[in-house]
Amino acid sequence: MADHNPDGDPTPRTLLRRVLDTADPRTPRRPRSARAGAQRALLETASSRRLSGQTKTIAKGRSRGARSIGRSAHVQARGHLEEQTPRTLLKNILLTAPESSILMPESVVKPVPAPQVVQPSRRESSRGSLELQLPELEPSTTLAPGLLAPGRRKQRLRLSMFQQGVDQGLPLSQEPQGNADASSLTSSLNLTFATPLQPQSVQRPGLARRPPARRAVDVGAFLRDLRDTSLAPPNIVLEDTQPFSQPTVGSPNVYHSLPCTPHTGAEDAEQAAGRRTQSSGPGLQNNSPGKPAQFLAGEAEEVDAFALGFLSTSSGVSGEDEVEPLHNGVEEAEKKMKEEGVSVSEMEATGAQGPSRAEEPEGHTQVTEAEGSQGTAEAEGPGASSGDEDASSRAASPELASSTPESLQARRHHQFPEPAPPPGAAVLSSEPAEPLLVRCPPRSRTTGPRPRQDPHKAGLSHYVKLFSFFAKMPMERKALEMVEKCLDKYFQHLCDDLEVFAAHAGRKTVKPEDLELLMRRQGLVTDQVSLHVLVERHLPLEYRQLLIPCAYSGNSVFPAQ
């Protein structure tokens, strides 16, 4: 058909022309149709040929009107067969193939648009369309083959989409999704792995920080709060150290919510006695700052007088009204004793350097007697005798000693040891305080060796339970003797057998292996049931410890080696 130069470049066109020159110009017969005709000739007989001739004549008479349609269909089928021959396929390839060399491809290949050829099926038409579209998606020859993997291709496409969104200054969610063209593909493959800087225009709501909520300053509210705090009394502002808000002037005070008890004459007497003790206490401190023992004695007398006056004033009140003043008076006495104890500790710190502790004990007792008589006279009032004062002071002193805290009394006795007063001294200093409740130490338990139970007795009870279990009925205590005899007889037979076995084998000592061999001959020990299994199953704990070494605490193994 065409001249072919053997020295020229082996292009697809030249190769196809050689194939066409050497191929048979006739359309080859299909082997399937040939096989079908041969089978049909073998199966035909005389009767079948006669019937087929009749059917053919009938079919010809009926199909005369449709011969034109059949002829056109036959022509189309014939053309259809001609299109499927290798010659027609190669002609179509020659029409669409470019004139280029296989060994030296050109840099840019632009396919020539071929005329549309009617394809016989959809599959072949799709193949032809793919052949036409493949040269458009050819990547550059400088790319590595490993970068064309499908998984990595998706990643590069994502990078290209991100780069395109950054270049356009649009958020990634608004970018249209679709297949990228060849230019975006090559640009994504040529990207470096450095992370690009994110511009201000790209909004990432997941990573953006929440703006701080700043409230505008309300000048009116600030001035109102300032006015409320300025109108509040200073003592409430200083005393209120709780973590909640300060009480304003218009708000109800916390202290008014507490129940207030009506004032009685007994409470007035308490307040008066408290004022007298407070006024007399600082005077004593100013007069004799270097005499702590004298100060303590006078203080005790004042508290005694206060308690005596309180009892005398509250004697005419009813039972319920009498309990509350007593409780309040005891609480006030405790508070005063604590405050005076703090002042005493300060006095000790200031006056410990001077030699004031070497005073005579007689002077101390005289001062305490004088001050005690003055305090009792003020609290009792005119018309009371000295004997009544002594009796009332003796009655009130135990209550006062019990009301004062024990830790404060111990600290005072430890700091200021009072000298021994003469027999005519004050009653409070001579009477001892109530003894404190001292807990007895727990008795130390003797940690001796625990008494071990006799394994023989424990074994007998175990065997009794075992016998009753296998007998499936309870057993009386009288049967225990018979069980014990059976056990003795069994162990006696076992020992005799061991002795005979040892004498026959020439052994001087019997080992566990010998016993296991004997019990294996008797049928008690088998491959499935070993000697240890029998011991664990049938012997009590005491015997098991003797036969099988058991580890105990203290790194000691029983039995000891």
UniProtKB/Swiss-Prot annotation:
Record note on modification: Dynamically phosphorylated during the cell cycle. Phosphorylated during G2 phase, metaphase and anaphase, but not during telophase or G1 phase.
Domain of life (superkingdom): Eukaryota
Pfam families reported in the protein's UniProt record: CENP-T_C, CENP-T_N
Region (Disordered): 1-78, 114-134, 256-293, 314-457
Keyword NAD in record: no
Family, similarity comment: Belongs to the CENP-T/CNN1 family.
One Gene Ontology biological process: chromosome organization
Region of interest called Flexible stalk domain, as start-end residue ranges on this chain: 93-421
UniProt GO molecular function: DNA binding; protein heterodimerization activity
Purpose: Component of the CENPA-NAC (nucleosome-associated) complex, a complex that plays a central role in assembly of kinetochore proteins, mitotic progression and chromosome segregation. The CENPA-NAC complex recruits the CENPA-CAD (nucleosome distal) complex and may be involved in incorporation of newly synthesized CENPA into centromeres. Part of a nucleosome-associated complex that binds specifically to histone H3-containing nucleosomes at the centromere, as opposed to nucleosomes containing CENPA.
Subunit-level organization: Component of the CENPA-CAD complex, composed of CENPI, CENPK, CENPL, CENPO, CENPP, CENPQ, CENPR and CENPS. The CENPA-CAD complex is probably recruited on centromeres by the CENPA-NAC complex, at least composed of CENPA, CENPC, CENPH, CENPM, CENPN, CENPT and CENPU. Identified in a centromeric complex containing histones H2A, H2B, H3 and H4, and at least CENPA, CENPB, CENPC, CENPT, CENPN, HJURP, SUPT16H, SSRP1 and RSF1. Interacts (via N-terminus) with the NDC80 complex.
Swiss-Prot/TrEMBL domain comment: The largest part of the sequence forms an elongated and flexible stalk structure that is connected to a C-terminal globular domain with a histone-type fold.
Species, as recorded: Macaca fascicularis (Crab-eating macaque)
Chain positions found as Phosphothreonine: T85
Primary residence: nucleus
Bias (Basic and acidic residues) ranges: 18-27, 329-341
Annotated protein name in UniProt: Centromere protein T
Segments of skewed composition (Polar residues): 45-57, 276-289, 365-376
Keywords from the UniProt entry: Cell cycle, Cell division, Centromere, Chromosome, DNA-binding, Kinetochore, Mitosis, Nucleus, Phosphoprotein
Keyword DNA-binding assigned: yes
Residue stretches of biased makeup (Low complexity): 439-450
